[in-house]
Amino acid sequence: MAKKYVVALDQGTTSSRAIIFDHDANIVSVSQREFPQIYPQAGWVEHDPMEIWASQSSTLIELLARSGIHGSEVAAIGITNQRETTVIWDKLTGKPVYNAIVWQCRRSSHICDELKAQGLEDYVRETTGLLLDPYFSGTKIKWILDNVAGVRERAEKGELLFGTIDTWLVWKLTEGKVHVTDPTNASRTLLFNIHTQQWDSKLLEALNIPESLLPEVKPSCAVYGKTRIAGEGGEISIAGIAGDQQSALFGQLCIDEGMAKNTYGTGCFLLMNTGKQAVKSTHGLLTTVAIGADCEVNYALEGAVFMGGATIQWLRDELGLIRDAQDTEYFASKVEDTNGVYLVPAFVGLGAPYWDPNARGALVGLTRGSNRNHIIRAALEAIAYQSRDLLDAMAKDSGVMLKQLKVDGGAVSNDFLMQFQADITNVEVQRPAITETTAMGAAFLAGLAVGFWSSTSELKHKADIERTFIPSISAEKCDELYCGWNRAVTQTIKS
């Protein structure tokens, strides 16, 4: 049967999804399942790895059944995933030794402090491009080894395997035959030298992590193994892997130096491709791995905002100001401005460029005249302000002043937010016709690996822009608003 489709598995923080793309990069069908979040104590976030696998595998089976597409028509499966989230399992039984520790989890802060005390901060920065922060996988691995009974001994005997979620899914899909990751995911572990593209022995020693735990690192665009849907039928190639943000960067075809995208999800993640040069940030950004025009390793600057769409969830779930996230555009548009109100959503600290884990959220500028509409508008504007923080830092680090910003993620359907983003950055904001760019990136990688598409040049004709938002306020007004935001952030950090 002719190979007509590519499937992307998009394993996220709150749900697992499977999406079928045809040769024109149109979405044919989507399947999605949510899974529970586990919060054992304040600042701790976990997932059950078996629930991740169950949700992801069931979406794949359901996707093909619902669409009527036979597995033999699928050219390849690509995988994109929440990054940094850490799983350790028994390599014989496949049973996890502990729940997956999620990227948001802060439990390993003390390990980061210990590494700083050992004088490793600069070495980590130079080698991995990252900061010493519990966000990344390395300290999560060490926490499991040190705190779960018997795990360190088993790891040192070579009985256990570590993986980020991509590695876990490939291992399960191949029935334990393949233990692999790609450079984009490896670069988020705190253990990977982004210059040599190798695991770093000094960092492994510092964290006391056996190298036998670690997966083999293969290119993002490659055939890793084969899988059978529900263990039946012919085999399908697993042929592309990228961490979610690098996958979105590739899906937006930001494959040349100076191109950037911002993903509006639970958090916001802004990445700029810096080509063959690993730019060292002096403004609070991360240096990470990206994917180039020929699927080769490129580098990128990355800024992460912890509270993007999660801020809107807070308005809905904790304050009860809205019933649905889509309501925010209506309420925000009912007022001309926020009447001086700023919301700094530092509920779990502040990410780039501040990196202050002790900052806490604040609602600044409230008066007797402040109402629900002002607060809702301030919440949306906060997402755009934080993205402006990242863009300014990138301009200082790279010397590149962006003229266009590509956007994706759930919140880009909010026209108010997109227009305000253009206004506050003085940059054109381009919204794609297909906003599933994270999944599209994985599909592109898989399709290129097996020859379903010939090159990224062919793909450029498949990424249409649905709307461009043009800056519409004066430079003076923009500066006035942004100065107010900076004052609010300063108060938050001081408090």
UniProtKB/Swiss-Prot annotation:
It catalyses: glycerol + ATP = sn-glycerol 3-phosphate + ADP + H(+). ADP binds at residues 13, 17, 266, 309, 410, 414. It comes from the Bacteria. The keyword Transferase applies. ATP binds at residues 13-15, 266, 309, 313, 410. Gene3D superfamilies: 3.30.420.40. Sn-glycerol 3-phosphate binds at residues 13, 83-84, 135, 244. The keyword ATP-binding applies. Pathway: Polyol metabolism; glycerol degradation via glycerol kinase pathway; sn-glycerol 3-phosphate from glycerol: step 1/1. Glycerol binds at residues 83-84, 135, 244-245. GO terms for cellular component: cytosol. GO terms for molecular function: ATP binding; glycerol kinase activity. InterPro entries: ATPase_NBD, Carb_kinase_FGGY, Carb_kinase_FGGY_CS, FGGY_C, FGGY_N, Glycerol_kin. GO terms for biological process: glycerol catabolic process; glycerol metabolic process; glycerol-3-phosphate metabolic process. Inhibited by fructose 1,6-bisphosphate (FBP). Keywords: ATP-binding, Glycerol metabolism, Kinase, Nucleotide-binding, Transferase. Transmembrane segments: none annotated. Its EC number is 2.7.1.30. Belongs to the FGGY kinase family. Key enzyme in the regulation of glycerol uptake and metabolism. Catalyzes the phosphorylation of glycerol to yield sn-glycerol 3-phosphate. PANTHER family: GLYCEROL KINASE, SUGAR KINASE. This is Glycerol kinase. It comes from Shewanella sediminis (strain HAW-EB3). The gene is glpK.
